[in-house]
Amino acid sequence: MTDVPVSRLRNFCIIAHIDHGKSTLADRLLQDTGTVAGRDMQEQFLDNMDLERERGITIKLQAARMNYTAADGESYVLNLIDTPGHVDFSYEVSRSLQACEGALLVVDASQGVEAQTLANVYLALENDLEIIPVLNKIDLPGSDPERIKEEIEAIIGLDTSTAIACSAKTGLGVSEIMQAVVDRIPPPADTLDEPTRALIFDSYYDSYRGVIVYFRVISGRISTKDKVLLMASKKSYELDEIGVMSPDQCEVNELHAGEVGYLAASIKAVADARVGDTITLLNAPADEPLPGYTEAKPMVFCGLFPTDADQYPDLREALDKLQLSDAALKYEPETSSAMGFGFRCGFLGLLHMEIVQERLEREYDLDLIVTAPSVIYKVNMIDGQMLMVDNPATLPDPQKRESIEEPYVRMEIYAPNEYNGTLMGLCQERRGEYIDMKYLTTERVTLIYELPLAEVVTDFFDQMKSRTKGYASMEYHLIGYRRNDLVRLDVLINAEKADPLTTIAHRDKAYSIGKGLVEKLKELIPRQQFKIPLQASIGSRIIASESISAMRKDVLAKCYGGDISRKKKLLKKQAKGKKRMKAMGKVDVPQEAFMAVLKLNQTS
């Protein structure tokens, strides 16, 4: 299986925006090369998680090995490394690009070039990959291949004279793509005689065999007899098995430079086999690891709490297990007076957060409360210290701090130009700073804004999509921190501070957010036997308040006429009971209330 000469290997990936047909094209390639039998075929074959199929997105990286007989009669081995297209998962894209020599750039022939496509193309160009433009969905009535070719040339600067038109759905043009992969993507460098180095581009946890590591051999060879050393974690392992994915795992004895495969070595946690780490041989280690890996940094933080306190150990275990397959997920224990014990978790972005939450609820049967997402703020203290704060409730008091800095992103929005005004309005509402506007073609425009990450992480994406009927797409990257007039907005329910509802807001927006918040809570918190005051405060100053009136029992129902003092006595007794109840009473805050905070931050 592995005696393929390096010259007949091709490693490639598919770059595409969400919904441009990447997973469908991958399915078609698997089917056309006979890698997957027709009867086993299902849509989005490489998307293993149910969640991926439902949302129609690729989250975890997959790889597949295909045998293909080219026009010259030679048999080639093609390794397809499937990549996610969503901006949150760009770290997964960057590492899979390092494992390839070429890429298929798939563009929807009716939609044109979108934001994430561009971000990933630039990553691919940085890695010196050979890029083959592919126009997909040409069977659709709205497709306009010539216009899209001009767009690709104008925006990316790629020559599209050899672009391939195809329809992944019907299979049209797929054989031309296979031939182009063989003809135009270079084979891996012939480095069989150099010290063994292999790049880990993905790993997942298998409950029977431990961590399964997907890797690409960059130089030398690896066989089942070898002991391997992971250069970043400095841990060594004996190999249990190595093999290739076609796309089901298939064991082999040896893999050499240029090949893509998997290994199992009873590795206990994914943290020991970090993605981007270099595998080398224990007996003959390489001098230095492969360059270019940076650890994924969480950008968005939120609290996760079980609704039932007894589920806390289960939540810890579930997060431990999820982290085995998701190296970008960070978490630490957190306690809150209102919610009890839970965890503060860090994510790459909002989609990543939603997916982790959904996987916890679905795969581990947990019922969770999620607090409003926040970002990392830099707080400069009066005594000269600098703190990094990811939880608004832990922000120091105003008298102790000198200033707060928040992360800013540079955002590029691509959209048809009739939506210009509404998009500029949206960015303005979110404290955006206009930088530039470029016309890509006569119909499409790029808006460039710099805005606070905190304004982006909640529902900016949803708002952008709804205001442009789904036609706009965006891409952003961090550009640094800026000082702003920010305040901590606390919410008091029945005179008790509710930590999970605390947010950090700009002073100009604080009043409207606070007012909206208490009004929303008034709708969502069920009435109790006693009156509940709801207040929003900045420091000790109350800026907005509402109250939920008490339910009361008619204690006078059994008094017919009679003496007024009898009625007064009963009413007095009731008032006394209510007072005691108010002092002792706990108010349960429903999950919707926490989610309302997110929406409010934005609409104000």
From Swiss-Prot:
Keywords: Cell inner membrane, Cell membrane, GTP-binding, Hydrolase, Membrane, Nucleotide-binding, Protein biosynthesis. It catalyses: GTP + H2O = GDP + phosphate + H(+). InterPro entries: EF-4, EFG_III/V, EFG_V-like, EFTu-like_2, G_TR_CS, GUFP, LepA_C_sf, LepA_CTD. One of its GO terms (cellular component) is plasma membrane. GO terms for molecular function: GTP binding; GTPase activity; ribosome binding. Residues 7-189 form the tr-type G domain. It is a peripheral membrane protein. CDD domains: EF4_II, EF4_III, LepA, lepA_C. Its main location: membrane. One of its GO terms (biological process) is positive regulation of translation. Pfam families: EFG_C (PF00679), GTP_EFTU (PF00009), GTP_EFTU_D2 (PF03144), LepA_C (PF06421). It is found in: Cell inner membrane. GTP binds at D19, H20, G21, K22, S23, T24, N136, K137, I138, D139. Its EC number is 3.6.5.n1. Required for accurate and efficient protein synthesis under certain stress conditions. May act as a fidelity factor of the translation reaction, by catalyzing a one-codon backward translocation of tRNAs on improperly translocated ribosomes. Back-translocation proceeds from a post-translocation (POST) complex to a pre-translocation (PRE) complex, thus giving elongation factor G a second chance to translocate the tRNAs correctly. Binds to ribosomes in a GTP-dependent manner. PANTHER family: TRANSLATION FACTOR GUF1 HOMOLOG, CHLOROPLASTIC, TRANSLATION FACTOR GUF1-RELATED. Belongs to the TRAFAC class translation factor GTPase superfamily. Classic translation factor GTPase family. LepA subfamily. This is Elongation factor 4. The lineage of its organism: Bacteria, Bacillati, Cyanobacteriota, Cyanophyceae, Synechococcales.
